[in-house]
């Protein structure tokens, strides 16, 4: 997908999937735990921002993001460092009731918070196999995620502009 959509651009794409690890660290006490284990405090890190930091001397990138609807962070590091970072978070997090949960629990929290994921909670019209599965952000009440005032082109822009002008065929309610 990246290569297909990079046609005509001067970009180089490198596969790093096996080299990078990410830990989703979510919940009301995550800031307190991070402030105890990081070299620099995370108090001033704004939503959707990132910072370089260290946990137990290991370089990490911390983003103030998450898909649970609660206070949350994502911690990015080299894959080889993931287990020691996990162990440190669990060690200090135990004082705050931090416990690991699976992806299904996180998905439920995400959906309850109204944070939907493309091709997980709904299938875009370009990928749906059957007509009833096709949906757009406007139909799902996610129009706030569409920045039509943003300059430049993005995939699906023309179709979304048309739908915004003419209205959606249906709308999800509830």
Q: Which residues fall in each region the model found?
A:
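Conserved, structured C-terminal
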Residues: 1-174
């Amino acid at each position: 997908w990246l290569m297909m959509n990079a046609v005509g651009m001067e970009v180089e794409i490198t596969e790093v999937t096996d080299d990078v690890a990410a830990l989703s660290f979510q919940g009301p006490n995550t800031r307190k735990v991070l402030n105890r284990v990081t070299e620099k405090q995370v108090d001033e890190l704004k939503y959707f921002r990132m910072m370089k930091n260290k946990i137990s001397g290991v370089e990490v990138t911390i983003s103030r993001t998450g898909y649970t609807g609660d206070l949350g962070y994502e911690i990015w590091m080299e894959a080889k460092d993931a287990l020691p970072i996990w162990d440190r978070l669990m060690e200090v997090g135990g004082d705050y009731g931090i416990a690991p949960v699976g992806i299904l629990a996180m998905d439920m929290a995400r959906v309850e918070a109204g944070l939907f994921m493309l091709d997980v909670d709904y299938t875009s019209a370009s990928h749906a196999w059957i007509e009833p599965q096709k949906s757009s952000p406007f139909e799902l009440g996610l129009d706030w995620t569409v920045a039509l005032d943003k300059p430049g082109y993005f995939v699906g822009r023309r179709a979304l502009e048309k739908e915004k002008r003419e209205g959606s065929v249906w709308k999800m309610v509830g």
